[in-house]
Amino acid sequence: VERYSKNALTQGRNLLTLEICKKMIRQFLQYDARRAAQGTLILKGVETKLDFEMQHPTLKLPMKFTGVVDRLEVYDNAFIIWDYKSGAIGQSDLSLSGLGDLWKGSKGKPLQILLYAWLLWKKELVTHPFPWHSGMFKLQSGQPEHLLRGAALGKSNDITEALLFDFEQALCDYLSEVPSN
């Protein structure tokens, strides 16, 4: 901040960006305050760094997976993995008919959440029992609680240990098929 003029945040595009950021933060804090007033909210982690190393079961190559989860919480005794999004989230973005959809390039949001859940599970960082839940918070509009859904998650739309076993198998299968050049 010291390198920029004092007017940098009081006019033009920077002022507009600052005001939009303030609005997003205000909406998020209001949402959080409402949830805390309505139920039991226990924050378990913010910007939690995850990493896991393993050897590919058939290729016998080392693999390292990393990620940063925006927020982990327990709300009314349900463990929730949150991801904050500054852009648009459509219902179809979060619908997953099968784990094979993850590798087609159009299901980045479900892939991200399932990878985070898998990393938490593999590292045994969560003591809360399954099922777990996922959430995405649209910062631009203040619209929360977009959950992963679809046949891949079953009727409950929950993240289960069985789903994470299947995810790991699908991930390893996909990585076996990726060309090495």
Locate predicted features.
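Metal-dependent nuclease catalytic regions and adjoining charged, substrate-binding loops involved
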Residues: 4, 106-108, 115-181
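Active-site-proximal structural scaffolding
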Residues: 14, 18-22, 39, 62-65, ...
